[in-house]
A protein has these predicted regions:
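Acidic/glycine-rich phosphate/pyrophosphate-binding loops and surrounding catalytic core
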Residues: 1-201, 205-212, 216, 225-233, ...
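Short, charged, intrinsically disordered terminal tails
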Residues: 266-282
Length: 282
């Protein structure tokens, strides 16, 4: 598991706030005196799984270390409409300047966590785990994968460096006469401690893969019947992952085939933001 470290949080908050604020928040400078004090809260306007609160808090700290922050919930918690996530007090100008950036993080990451929880709940009672993918917003992978965990999902490989995933293009570009055994052997030699996964899209490919003692087999765009047959053929000799067009409507049926994992790109690549708002209390 790749933890969401304080360094990652600080970097993300500073980069995002700098992008939004630029040299100065000119509207707030023109309208709000620096000595004005205020209290505010960030609250959910719809039911959701909260994620991104530590990043939102860091945005406020980055803008003004003198702001007082009081968390009213923790990431991973289920919020109902009207529930408070965070209370902020101090300089009114600082609160206004940091507001949008802080909300952006909470809205986007809570969207990921909430979407993930829907998929996790859909396969409840089976042994199947919901995986994320590398289909993340550039620059936000650590945050999005953290949000997947907040929603009860499991992280797949974090990047191209921590797990092998051999696909047909890799084999085709190895050179004339290269075999799957050659590819697996090269992977084992390069990084023996890393897990090796091989993608298949036909049942007749499985027998050869099993002779190579790989860790995981990705079943790409197979029908439910093909997945059931694949799980039977593999018989626990490797972990199984179903991938391709995974929707909430069919994910339960896919889990029922007996696969160990279902990877869902939609957890991160096209998530709807959750509606949060900041309300000034004073």
């Amino acid at each position: 598991v790749h933890e969401l470290t304080p360094a990652i949080i600080r970097e993300a908050a500073a980069r995002a706030l700098g992008e939004d604020r630029g040299p100065a928040d000119i509207t707030t400078m023109a309208c709000v005196a620096s000595e004005v004090r205020a209290e505010a809260r960030i609250f959910a306007k719809e039911a959701c799984v909260l994620a991104g609160l530590p990043v939102a808090e860091q945005v406020f700290r980055e803008q003004d270390p003198g702001l007082r922050l009081e968390s009213a919930a923790r990431d991973g918690a289920l919020l109902h409409p009207g529930d408070t996530a965070l209370k902020i007090s101090g300089s009114a100008a600082s609160i206004l300047t940091a507001e949008r950036c802080a909300l952006n993080f909470i809205q986007q990451l809570s969207g990921v966590a909430t979407r993930t929880r829907l998929f996790v709940d859909a396969v409840a009672g089976t042994s199947c785990q919901i995986l994320d993918t590398r289909k993340t917003v550039p620059g936000l992978r650590a945050l999005q994968k953290y949000a997947v965990r907040c929603g009860g999902g499991t992280n797949h490989r974090f990047g191209l460096y921590d797990m092998f995933l051999l696909k047909d293009n890799h084999l085709a570009l190895m050179g004339p006469g290269a075999t799957l055994a050659d590819a697996v052997g090269a992977a084992r030699s390069l990084k023996p401690e890393a897990r090796v996964e091989v993608e298949v899209d036909r049942l007749d490919q499985i027998a050869e893969v099993l002779t190579l003692q790989v860790d995981q087999i990705l079943l790409d765009n197979m029908t439910l019947e093909q997945m059931r047959d694949a799980v039977s053929l593999i018989a626990g000799r490797a972990k199984t992952e179903a991938s391709g067009n995974m929707t909430l409507e069919r994910v339960r049926d896919v889990a029922a085939t007996g696969v160990d994992f279902i990877s869902v790109g939609a957890l991160t690549h096209s998530v709807r933001a959750i509606d949060f708002s900041l309300e000034m209390l004073v």
